Amino acid sequence: KNILTVEQPDSSSSDGIFYYDEASKRVQISALAL
């Protein structure tokens, strides 16, 4: 299965989660407040 890594930006950056999919070489930004 695809390996998905999740990273959280610093508080200085806008709130969001970066999803990086190595298989698709795509980066999606989700503006979800945790």
Curated annotation (Swiss-Prot):
Residues spanning the membrane: none
Domain of life of the source: Eukaryota
Gene Ontology CC annotation, any one: COP9 signalosome
Residues forming coiled coils: none
Any GO MF annotation of the entry: metal ion binding
Cofactor(s) needed for function: a divalent metal cation
Keyword set includes Metal-binding: yes
Places the protein is found: Cytoplasm; Nucleus
EC numbers, comma separated: 3.4.-.-
GO process annotations (BP): proteolysis; red, far-red light phototransduction
Keyword field: Cytoplasm, Developmental protein, Hydrolase, Metal-binding, Metalloprotease, Nucleus, Phytochrome signaling pathway, Protease, Signalosome
Oligomer and partners: Component of the CSN complex, probably composed of CSN1, CSN2, CSN3, CSN4, CSN5 (CSN5A or CSN5B), CSN6 (CSN6A or CSN6B), CSN7 and CSN8.
Role: Probable protease subunit of the COP9 signalosome complex (CSN), a complex involved in various cellular and developmental processes such as photomorphogenesis and auxin and jasmonate responses. The CSN complex is an essential regulator of the ubiquitin (Ubl) conjugation pathway by mediating the deneddylation of the cullin subunits of the SCF-type E3 ligase complexes, leading to decrease the Ubl ligase activity of SCF. In the complex, it probably acts as the catalytic center that mediates the cleavage of Nedd8 from cullins.
Family: Belongs to the peptidase M67A family. CSN5 subfamily.
Official protein name in the record: COP9 signalosome complex subunit 5a
Organism: Brassica oleracea
